[in-house]
Structure formats: structure tokens, C-alpha cells
UniProtKB/Swiss-Prot annotation:
Consists of three domains: the N-terminal catalytic domain, the editing domain and the C-terminal anticodon-binding domain. The keyword Aminoacyl-tRNA synthetase applies. Homodimer. This is Proline--tRNA ligase.
């Protein structure tokens, strides 16, 4: 591609409304332009990157045995009503009516459509397993679109759906798709982790997320320092610590006026927060009168409640909701800052770490008072459970090493859906006995457009993007010095351009007549082109060309006759 005939829409200024580096650089490098909140135009350079990601995804899906289909973005409400999600999904589902007042939605996902398609096409267990995928635009009406294409309302996604006659068959395909996802992210060149995850609104049983590690990530990923274990913090098990061995001391009630927080209590009583417990009162399941009961959740003072773990408890309402202050006061006789586990007349769940304490500090269920030297023999009947988030340094649940936590950007998610949709929508085949058998489903998603932004979050410096070779808009930039005035420079540039193109490289020849050398060099850095060749008269007189790898700070001189072989090796090694 010649720069003189190509839209290079770079600019120097950092947009004021771009919060994360990927959004800033995608705008500055001329990859995207904002159309409206959460909606973006993809410019030529950006689309090149997007298509390369798409190609890698498509190749690995084909290799995994999935068949490509294409389903409509606009979906009839009837299918969503049939699955039960028309009302459940919430405002993220953009609902529309056509001219005949028939209800539709813009698809945020395609479980209903694929289930409807396959229930009409597959008739026998002999046709299973079957795996279908598409690369299609999705729309989710995010309440607050942000971070550019990272959390846009309209985005490009690869979603695949598999159909099976048995759980064992689903597991086989699930493992194949898991491996395919790893291959995709390996080929792109991302630092990622597959992690155990919650199924969320999609539903189902087993689930893994694929996270690109980046400081700007919105999710906390817990992983072992000595094994491959990794899980979303929400799902990582917090193992029970050894019980403290101190002898129980007599419990004392002490005045703690105007003290509401764990930190303030610990400071006033001169104890570490690790020797305190906090009691959270949440809404429980409804009683016979249709009113919410109350449930107490007790944690060590320095630990945070894990909502996902909490809602799995028998007495806790879903979604998790804290009880209002008036209800707490009426039930316990004290305000939030003075609550404790002793003397409660409601279900009490105590986290493992809190249960290991001896002689701890807790609220006395009396405004302005706490207990010191409290012990679990004093407390109401309770059940010991895991309801906290893991923290750095915790022993890993796998038994190897300790927990480290990093931020991650979710770029893929795979689910074992089971029969959630096939049962609701009566998607079945005839089994070997001629009887109806509900198909078991798997679901596999990758955020194609999100991968582009995620790759930037891992690969940039002060000068711009540093693309991995596999998805760079161009592999090589040829930058001439005074091409319009030097026949030798022009000839060598054209020669290199032809040779590299013939070898299958995407090449950008910076042949814009009025462009300055400094501006051209800055643009190639900003756009993240991995390999750059500068052609000038001085170098040619010495039989040399200046080469610079985008990842390196310094350039080097390469013999003219060796440059093609050098580029071949550089692209192969990524250096």
C-alpha cells in the first residue's frame, strides 16, 4: 500500500474523553473514529487489524471442526420469550418494533437463534456432535459505554454453539474449543490466562474466561505462583487457615462511641484488623408472608465479601441485597457500626478465616459498644463457609504456591450450557431407541474487536502502539529520504516494495510527496508497524539500509543485499 493513496489519519493530541491507553492510541493512530456513544467507525488501518484477528479466529475454529454460519443481528421477540430471557435480560437488550408492530431485538448473543435453527435441521443423534460458529456484529445497550471499543455498544464477536447427545461428548468438544482458544491467543501474541469463571446470565455449568493481563483490566484474576491454576477472584476458593491456638479469655463489653468502621475500632482498641470480625446483614429468602428474612454474614475485618459465593448460600436471596438500616435496627437492636455475631436470632454464616480466630473483637449488637475477647462458643448457632475474596499471599486452592492477583481484560468466555436453552425451546433429536433426546449445548464466545484494544493495552510505549506481527496493519514500513529528488532512493524503495509484497508481506511505502521525514517516522511508530526500513542516499552509497524494530529503541544498518533475508528472519522470530 502506498501512503500517497492511503488514509493515514494520525494526530498528535490525546483526546480528552479517552480514558484508557488503547482508546487514546486507536484514535491517535487513525484506527477508529467515534460516531456516537459506544459506536465507532473503523478506518482502513484499524479494519486491517480487525480482519487479521478475524482470520486467525476463523482458521482455528475451522481447525477445531466448527462450521461457519451467519445469523441475523435482528431477532424476533418470540424466540427470547420462548427461552424466558425476554424479561430476564434487562435494559441491555435493545428492543424494537417493526412497521407491523412486531417485537424484535438487536442481538447481544445468539443462543435462541442457533437453538431454533438447529432444532429444525438436526433430527438424529447420528448427526451429533455438531459445532457451528459465526463472526457477527452484536449490540448491547450498555448503560455507560466507555474505553472505546473495549466496552462499546456495538461490537464484533465470534460466537460458537455445539450440540451433543451426552455430557461426555460435550466435554470432549469443550476441551477442543478450550485448546483452540489458547491457540488463537498464542498466535496473536497475547499474555493471557484461561480462568475458572461464573456462567452469569448465559447460564449453564462449567465455564472458563480468557483474560488478557493488563493494568487497565476490569477483572481481578487470581492465579498460583507455582502452577497453572487461575480463576476469577469471584470463584477462587479461600482455604481455611489454621485455627488460632490461644486460650480463650473472658469476654468484655467496651464502649466505642461514634466508632463505625473496622479500621476505627481496631485503632481505638489497639488491635490489628486481622483480629476483628465484621457482621453484614443481607436479605434472605422470602418467608410465607412474602417478606424477606434476614441473614448474617460474618468475615474477618480485613476481608471483603464475595457476592457470588454469598448468593449460593441456602438462606441468602438472589440477587444479593443488603438489609436496610431500619430493618436491621428492628431485628438486632443496633445500628450497622455495632453489629456482631453474638446473640443473633437469624441464620449466621461465618467465613473460614473469621472462624479460625480466638479472642477477637466484634460488635456487641448495642449502639456504641463492642466486645473484646469474643469467641465462637459465645456466638449464636452458625455455619462455617467460604464467603470471602482471596487476597495476595493466600495459599493456592490447587495446593501449590500462593495466590497472586492481577488485572485482566476478558476477551473470551466458554460455557457448558447443558440443556438450559434446548430444554426450554424443545430442541431434541431421536436417540438410538427412536425416542426424543434433548440436546446438550456448549457456547463459546470471543470478542474480536475487543482483542484489538486488549493487544494495545499490552503492547505500547510513549511513541504509540507496538503491534504483534500477526495482527499489525502492515508488517513493514519503507521510509524514503527525499524520494522525489533521488532516483536511487526511489528505485530502491520501489524494488523493496515489490519484493516484500511478492513475499506476502503487507507493506506501507511512505511515498507522500510533501511528508517530512520526522513526521513519517513518527507515524510508523504511532501506528505500531513492527519493522521499518529507511532508505537514503548516504546509506545506499555505503551499501546499507537503516532498519528498526518497533520494539527496540535503536536502529541498525543492514547490507542492502541482506535486507530481505533479514526481514524474513525478523518476522519469523517477532524481533
Amino acid at each position: 500500500m502506498r501512503a500517497s493513496k492511503y488514509l493515514i489519519a494520525t494526530y498528535k493530541e490525546t483526546p480528552a474523553d479517552a480514558e484508557v491507553i488503547s482508546h487514546q492510541l486507536m484514535l491517535r493512530a487513525g484506527l477508529i473514529r467515534k460516531l456516537a456513544s459506544g459506536l465507532y467507525n473503523w478506518l482502513p488501518a484499524g479494519l486491517r487489524v480487525l480482519r487479521k484477528v478475524e482470520t486467525i479466529v476463523r482458521e482455528e475454529m475451522d481447525r477445531a471442526g466448527a462450521q461457519e454460519v451467519l445469523m441475523p443481528v435482528v431477532q424476533p421477540a418470540e424466540l427470547w420469550e420462548e427461552s424466558g430471557r425476554w424479561q430476564q435480560y434487562g435494559p441491555e437488550l435493545l428492543r424494537i418494533n417493526d412497521r407491523h408492530d412486531r417485537a424484535f431485538c438487536l442481538g447481544p448473543t445468539h443462543e435462541e437463534v442457533i437453538t431454533d435453527l438447529i432444532r429444525n435441521e438436526l433430527k438424529s443423534y447420528k448427526q451429533l456432535p455438531a459445532n457451528f460458529y459465526q463472526i457477527q456484529t452484536k449490540f448491547r445497550d450498555e448503560v455507560r459505554p466507555r474505553f472505546g471499543v473495549m466496552r462499546a455498544r456495538e461490537f464484533l464477536m465470534k460466537d460458537a454453539y455445539s450440540f451433543h447427545a451426552s455430557q461426555e461428548c460435550l466435554q470432549e468438544t469443550y476441551d477442543i474449543m478450550h485448546a483452540a482458544y489458547c491457540k488463537i491467543f498464542d498466535r496473536i501474541g497475547l499474555d493471557y490466562r484461561p480462568v475458572l469463571a461464573d456462567t452469569g446470565s448465559i447460564g449453564g455449568t462449567g465455564s472458563h474466561e480468557f483474560h488478557v493481563l493488563a493494568d487497565s483490566g476490569e477483572d481481578d484474576i487470581a492465579f498460583s505462583t507455582e502452577s497453572n491454576f487461575a480463576a476469577n477472584v469471584e470463584l477462587a476458593e479461600a482455604l481455611a487457615p489454621a485455627k488460632q491456638t490461644a486460650e480463650p479469655l473472658p469476654r468484655e463489653e467496651v464502649a466505642t462511641p461514634n466508632v463505625k468502621t473496622i479500621e476505627d475500632v481496631a485503632k481505638l482498641l489497639d488491635v490489628p484488623t486481622t483480629q476483628t470480625v465484621k457482621t453484614l446483614i443481607v436479605k434472605g429468602v422470602e418467608n410465607e408472608d412474602g417478606k424477606h428474612t434476614l441473614v448474617a454474614l460474618v468475615l474477618r475485618g480485613d476481608h471483603a465479601l464475595n457476592d457470588i459465593k454469598a448468593i449460593k448460600l441456602a438462606h441468602v436471596a438472589n440477587p444479593l441485597e443488603f438489609a436496610d438500616e431500619s430493618g436491621i435496627k428492628a431485628a438486632v437492636g443496633a445500628e450497622v457500626g455495632s453489629l456482631g455475631p453474638i446473640g443473633l436470632s437469624m441464620p449466621v454464616y461465618v467465613d473460614r478465616a473469621a472462624a479460625a480466630l480466638v479472642n477477637f473483637v466484634c460488635g456487641a449488637n448495642k449502639d456504641g459498644y463492642h466486645y473484646t475477647n469474643a469467641n465462637w462458643s459465645d456466638a449464636a448457632e452458625h455455619k462455617v463457609v467460604d464467603i470471602r475474596n482471596v487476597v495476595i499471599g493466600d495459599p493456592s486452592p490447587c495446593g501449590k504456591g500462593t495466590i497472586d492477583i492481577k488485572r485482566g481484560i476478558e476477551v473470551g468466555h466458554i460455557f457448558q450450557l447443558g440443556t438450559k436453552y434446548s430444554e426450554a425451546m424443545k430442541a431434541s433429536v431421536l436417540d438410538e431407541n427412536g425416542k426424543d433426546k434433548t440436546m446438550i449445548m456448549g457456547c463459546y464466545g470471543i470478542g474480536v474487536s475487543r482483542i484489538v484494544a486488549s493487544a494495545i493495552e499490552q503492547n505500547y510505549d510513549d511513541n504509540g502502539i507496538i503491534w504483534p506481527d500477526a495482527i499489525a496493519p502492515f508488517h513493514v514500513a519503507i521510509v524514503p529520504i527525499n524520494m522525489q529528488k533521488s532516483e536511487a532512493v526511489a528505485q530502491k524503495c520501489e524494488e523493496l516494495y515489490a519484493q516484500l509484497n511478492q513475499l506476502g508481506y503487507d507493506v506501507l511505502l511512505m511515498d507522500e510527496p510533501k511528508a517530512r521525514l520526522g513526521g513519517m517516522l513518527a507515524d510508523t511508530e504511532l501506528m505500531g508497524i513492527p519493522h521499518r526500513i529507511v532508505v537514503g542516499d548516504r546509506g545506499l552509497e555505503k551499501g546499507q539500509l537503516e532498519y528498526k524494530c518497533r520494539r527496540d529503541s535503536d536502529s541498525q544498518d543492514i547490507a542492502v543485499d541482506d535486507i530481505i533475508e533479514f526481514i524474513n528472519n525478523a518476522v519469523k522470530t517477532g524481533k
